[in-house]
């Protein structure tokens, strides 16, 4: 019997291939004590805000390269506007952009392209941190 906590992970990118790459790299169970994951895909910034406002999302993985609304701006917006926001991870294509991730107040970064060796560990760590403070159902 597993004591793993199920979690809902929102993945945002304007590009379907990036959303698929994140889901594939992380999988349904990123660690023995984390998951299974339910994936929610969003293709627009408006969808992300609406979904997070609906409650029940544990983690958002946001593509910093998305157009027209980038994941870094969305992370900043969610931090400012949502008191009990989910954990936030932004995907960045260039390491020099890590300062932008810091500005956005994201909890973690992952490089693009997504590395299937590191992505599950980053996601699992973020979700473990959430266990004691589950999102408020609205």
Regions found by a protein language model. Give the residues of each.
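Conserved acidic segment of CheY-like receiver
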Residues: 6-27, 60
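Acidic, metal-coordinating helix/loop segments flanking the phosphotransfer/catalytic sites
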Residues: 42-59
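Conserved phosphoryl-transfer motifs of two-component systems
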Residues: 59, 107-111, 116
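C-terminal output helix
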Residues: 21, 114-123
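Alpha4 helix (beta4-alpha4-beta5 surface) of REC/receiver domains from two-component response regulators
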Residues: 93-109
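His-Asp phosphorelay/catalytic-motif detector in bacterial-type signaling
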Residues: 82-87
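Short hydrophobic/Thr-rich beta-strand motif most characteristic of the beta2 strand and flanking loop
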Residues: 34-43
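Conserved phosphotransfer microenvironments
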Residues: 58-79
């Amino acid at each position: 019997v597993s004591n793993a906590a199920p979690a809902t992970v929102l993945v945002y990118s304007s590009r379907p291939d990036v959303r698929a790459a994140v889901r594939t790299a992380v999988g349904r169970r990123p660690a023995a004590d984390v998951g299974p994951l339910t994936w929610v895909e969003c293709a627009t910034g408006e969808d992300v805000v609406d979904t997070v406002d609906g409650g029940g999302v544990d983690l958002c993985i946001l593509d910093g390269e998305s157009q027209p609304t980038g994941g870094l701006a969305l992370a900043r917006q969610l931090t400012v506007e949502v008191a009990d926001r989910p954990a936030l991870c932004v995907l960045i294509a260039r390491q020099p952009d890590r300062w932008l991730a810091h500005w956005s107040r994201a909890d973690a970064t992952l490089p693009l392209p997504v590395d299937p060796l590191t992505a599950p560990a980053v996601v699992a760590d973020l979700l473990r941190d959430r266990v004691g403070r589950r999102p408020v159902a609205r």
